[in-house]
Amino acid sequence: GMRQHGKVSEVTEKKTAVYVDDQQRILIRQLARSWLWRSELPTWLLFVTVYGGWFACVAGWRTLGLFPATLLLIWFTAWYMSLQHELIHGHPTRLAWFNQLLGTLPLAVWYPYGVYRDSHLAHHRNHLLTHPEDDPESYYVTAESWQRFSAWQRRLIHLRNTFWGRLLLAPLMDIVHTLRSALRAFREGDHRAIAMWSLHLLLLTGLLAWMAAQGLSPLWFVLAVSYPALALTKVRSFLEHRAADDPLARSVINEAGLPWRVLFLNLNYHAVHHDLPGVPWYALRQLYLHRQTAYLQRNQGFLVRGYGEWRRHFSRRAVAVNAHPGFGEQAQAGGEHG
């Protein structure tokens, strides 16, 4: 447990925080002393809402009707993934093992919490952000890979880089990648990964058995709830990062509408989250609005006015996220500060 705790606190500790200025640092220090931040009440309420809502929908799906229950379950399942992200960053408690306990149930089916945590913390090394080999969440590929790819592989990436293609294809590609890494762990006898996957499968079996006992088909859940929930999370990450020389300019500010902000727990203000990974979800909007101009200067105007903008721009056109262009001199020099 300690090793994992070290990893988590490493990302949430103050030393990784990049403040806009001293005024913001003072504001955050004040907020951190407030009752709201110390109690973490919003996150606890969210936890109760997500779990309560998810289990109530499965237990009461006949009362709700299959279609309404399915739509609600897609929402709660995607929301659970947003909650897991919050747990990774040290909320609602400072205890990594306890947070892990709160996020271990496989409500979203595909990923053990530990897999998400390890890859996500690697993604938070801002100086390596978007780099295909160092950032596990990057959609870029290395120039060498791109050269090697056959026509159909490039076509697949081109499709994945359209808005609807990303929603339909990216979850499947992620699932294949994750299952391959699981098989590799079993083949190579990686004890930690085997333990994690075994627990995940055990819990998943129990969860789906309970679901079947409620008369809801686990196959229906996997295809009609879990997959669309993953697709919803792909809306957020569609062009969340770009390969810019300056690490500060690699993360987007997306001025999304209220339902999206609630579902994604304000992660649409992504540049703010990458600067201040330890700040809880309910403060990100306030901190962005408090320093709006500064943030848009820092991230070099990487601003989107809502997710609809991506849908309109990239329904037919593909976004240019293929071979990574590499980082310029400035990024190499300033590398370790990110």
Ranges and model annotations:
Residues 67, 83-84, 97-102, 116-119:
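Generic hydrophobic, aliphatic-rich segments that mediate packing or membrane embedding
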Residues 1-76, 106-122, 126-219, 223, ...:
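Non-catalytic, topology-defining segments of multipass membrane proteins
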Residues 81-89, 99-106, 270:
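Glycine-/proline-rich flexible loop or hinge segments
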Residues 85-90, 120-124:
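Active-site recognition of the HExxH zinc-binding catalytic motif
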